[in-house]
Amino acid sequence: GLGLRYVQGIGSFATFDEFLHLTYGGARWSSSTRVLYSTSDNDFRFRNYNSKEFVTDDDGQIVGEYYPLQRNRNGGFRDLHVMQELYYTTRGGDRFSLAAWYLDSHRGLAMLTSDRNKSKQKQNTQDERTLRAVAGWERLRNGLKLGARAGYTYTDLRYLLKQDPEGKGQFVVNTDARSRIHTLFAKAEAEYALGEKWLFSANAALHQHRVRSGDLSVIGNNGLRADTLYRQERFELSAFAAVKWRPVPRLGVAADLRWELYGDRTTPVIPALFADYVLSKRGSVVVRASAARNYRYPTLNDLYFRPGGNKNLKPERGWTFDAGLETTLKGDARSLRASATAFDSRIDDWILWIGSPKLGIDTPINIRRVHSYGVEAKLSAEAETSGGWRLLLDGNFAWTRSINRGDPFSPADESVGKQLVYIPVYSAALTARVEWRRWELTYKWNWYSERYTMSSNDLGVLGRVKPYFMSDLSLEKGLDCKWASFSLKGCIHNLLNEEYESVLSRPMPRLNV
């Protein structure tokens, strides 16, 4: 039958969201159409701690100082998403699918708090148009599952920087970076279950990339537009095989092998091994462990992006190990699940984009070795009372160390032995939800410790993003009538009105709805 769902959202800072979902389901055919349209001025107020103002008396003597309240500048956006899916199932059980997704986005890139320009003097925008179309086929018979997909993706990305120092509306283009990316792809996969103890799977995928990217605003010595485009194509092929074996109900073992070809180069065979064992059926206590080789080759942007690409980059390679414990407790109308995992990863030639003082731009480099290790813990609980109340809780905590173990690039390089930039050492999140009849109350909380913004881990004014926590609260009520179902939902973001930045010099909104 036919289905219709429409959601209208209205929020702070002239934010409007509209979502429409149309569905149809028949004996053989089914269809799904989704449309999402979002707009916002995104001009929230914040206190600018990078711009100190001084108060003077009639004699010009400084008698006070303060940090001014300002509005977020050039941060508005408009996004349109359209997705169409069509499915057909034959009498023999084959399932064919067609899907297309389109994105049309226009976003202003908000000015940094340290930027002294006005909106009339500087405009930063990014426009993106992306089309992705995929055709697929699936079949499941006698324990054998087969599938194939093929498609095409096109992206047109434009970054535009315009400036008018006098603020008279006569903008001059400083940067007009354009990227057009074409990708053809195909994938075939198979999965076969041999009894209850064995499961075999394999897939092969290929991609053909074609990229044209550069700055169209550059003028050469002859007064004509310079050709800064990089034109690159690359063929990529990957093959993957896996086997899972459960010799006894308590023990499970799995092994993976992966191999890839990119351009005229190939990766080594990349193995991975997984195991899990039920220590105790009482409490469902399970211990898990894995070991995997890592290998990541540079992307076309890493190699050739202008300006900044590095054609001499080496691929990342290394090993990752992890081990953990999980338990699940269930009772009448309640359950509890907890897990803890420790991991250790050592990567050679880690690819990292950094600012180059010599070139004045960001460029990717290889760090000889990065050692990443830590612990992750998760907890979820659920309970239901005789009065119809339902309580749900999900939480997680992580301790992560990502240390540069490479060699210094110069005598002044203080990054060796330090935490990588923008990776918090501690982080945590919690979601609590209460449901009763058609009411739902949800509280979300997350926290991040300080993050370094300089590879030396200097704690100066511009050397870190301060720790912060966030609280969101929402209340939803469902309503039913003979011909439709409705819901009303109210949300409060940043409930405790926290002042914070997620990226240096880019403040985030305080309390808003």
Where are the language model's segments positioned?
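Short strand-turn segments of transmembrane beta-barrel domains in outer membranes
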Residues: 1-24, 33-35, 70-75
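Flexible loop and strand-edge segments within Gram-negative outer membrane beta-barrel domains
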Residues: 73-79, 93-146, 152-182
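Gram-negative outer-membrane beta-barrel transporters
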Residues: 246-251, 338, 342-346, 366-454
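Structural signature of Gram-negative outer-membrane beta-barrels, strongest in the C-terminal barrel
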Residues: 197-201, 205-209, 224-345, 431-433
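C-terminal beta-signal and adjacent terminal beta-strands/loops
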Residues: 40-46, 447-456, 475-513
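Periplasmic-side early beta-strands and strand-to-turn transitions of outer-membrane beta-barrels
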Residues: 24-126
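Membrane-embedded beta-barrel scaffold of Gram-negative outer-membrane proteins
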Residues: 34-36, 40-42, 143-161, 278-280, ...
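Outer-membrane beta-barrel transmembrane domain signature of Gram-negative proteins
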Residues: 126-128, 152, 168-254, 421, ...
